[in-house]
Structure formats: C-alpha cells, structure tokens
Swiss-Prot record:
Protein's gene: Grtp1
Tagged with keyword Nucleotide-binding: no
Cellular component aspect of the GO annotation: cytoplasm; plasma membrane
One Pfam family matching this protein: RabGAP-TBC
Claim: Amino-acid biosynthesis is one of the keywords in the record: no
Domain of life: Eukaryota
Protein name: Growth hormone-regulated TBC protein 1
Gene3D superfamilies: putative rabgap domain of human tbc1 domain family member 14 like domains, Ypt/Rab-GAP domain of gyp1p, domain 3
Gene Ontology terms for molecular function: GTPase activator activity
PANTHER family linked: GROWTH HORMONE-REGULATED TBC PROTEIN 1 (PTHR47219:SF10), RAB GTPASE-ACTIVATING PROTEIN 1-LIKE (PTHR47219)
Keyword set, alphabetical order: GTPase activation
Amino acid sequence: MDPAERAQAARARVPRIDPYGFERPEDFDYAAYEEFFSTYLVILTKRAIKWSKLLKGSGGVRKSVTDLNRTFPDNVMFRKTADPCLQKTLYNVLLAYGLHNQDVGYCQGMNFIAGYLILITKNEEESFWLLDALVGRILPDYYSPAMLGLKTDQEVLAELVRMKLPAVAALMDGHGVLWTLLVSRWFICLFVDILPVETVLRIWDCLFNEGSKIIFRVALTLIKQHQEFILEASSVPDICDKFKQITKGDFVTECHTFMQKIFSEPGSLSMATITRLRESCRAALQAQS
C-alpha cells in the first residue's frame, strides 16, 4: 500500500472528531496519528497491567501512611463523609507507589502531591503515573529516606540568592537562618497549600514540561519581588513571618502575571549553573554527614 492509500485508509478508521469534541483540521496527518497511537496503546496497556498488579498486591502490605486525615481537610471530597471519599483513592495511590518504588516507599509530603494529582485527573491510575514521573524522574531523591535531593536543592536556592540577591543572603547569614526553615515546604509540597490553586497548577504545567528548574524560578521570583519587605526583618521570627506573607496577596493570586514574572524576574538561570551548584552542594552535604 502506497503512502496515499495508507493515509486514506487511516482517515477512514480515525474519527474526524477528537476525544475532546474538536474537529480535526483538513491537514491532519491521520496515518502518523494512527501509527503513534498504536505504539502508545501498547505503553498504556503495559501501564494498566502494572497498575492492576500493584493494586492487587497492596492488600498484603502494611505501610505507615498516616497523613490521610491531614490531606486537604478543608476539601469536602477528602472528608470521610464524602461519597466517594478521595481518602481511599489517595491511600491506593500512595500504597501502590510504595510497592512500585520501595527505595522511596512513603515520605511525608507525598500525600499533598498525590492528593492534588487526584483532584486534577479524577483518576487513580493516571495520578499514580504522574506521581511516578515527579518522584522518580523529575525530582529524584526529593522523597527518598535521606531526602538528599531536597536538601541539595534548598542549598542551591541559597547559593542562587547569594548570587542574585546578595542583600537577602546577607540578612540570612547575619541572623544565622537556615534556608530549610524558610522554604522546606515550598520544595516538599511543590507549593501546594502555599500558593493559590490556579497558580500551583500553572507552575506544575511548567514543572512537568521543563523540569525542576521551575521551582528555583518561582522561589527566586517570590523573594526578589518582595526583597525590600524581607529586608525590613529584624529577627529570626520576623524573617520567618515575612517568608510566609510573601506567598499571599494579589501578586501570587494573579497567576497569568505571576507566570510571566517567573520567566523574567530571576534573569538567566541555566541548567549548567544549576547542575554545577547541585554537584557542589551535594558534596558539601555528604561531607557533613
């Protein structure tokens, strides 16, 4: 069958309307789409089988997943009285992930990440695979028992602030403030329950597309935008309070403007720089331990 015939045959098999209700354009490549989807369908099938096995296997596993009641207590869908109650879905996802990635198991903070994914996708299996992409690929060692990746990136942020916002770095040094005291929840929860929902969703779009660099962009933008306010602090409790306040207000609520700012405010931020800082910060942390 020549290319023209294959294209015509594919056009007859593939619906003109896509699954989201949109009509496909005249120049849509039906043959390429069919070829891609036939390959992708194999991947989806393998994933579905894997998910099914994990879910069945979780019955015999006893895991310390203790944060369910503290996951979005203000969200009616996570309350025990809800029907259906998303606590059960969250439990399934976390338990299955503990089986899938036993080096990580369950780590505090993952409940918020998984819970958000469940709210977004409304699907256990999709939430599981997105969680795997975050924990296993995009943010390796963030949620491992030693949390070395998380600790490293907090130190990287400190170095970036030292490079780009020296006055803020001097304030921290002058008061002996550890950055983990200020930003650990930003990194652990990926801004969930810290920034407004719509803003977090926009950040996560970039996180899945561009990788972990986006976390530094968000953090640097928050600090730079409020630099004068932060520099008014005169004590450690005052600094901590100001870092809580900078995650509130119109600046973070207006997500479109905020997302534009995170790509302009921090200035140049190459992966080469981040990789170099990660290597030096990780080595320093390992030397300390």
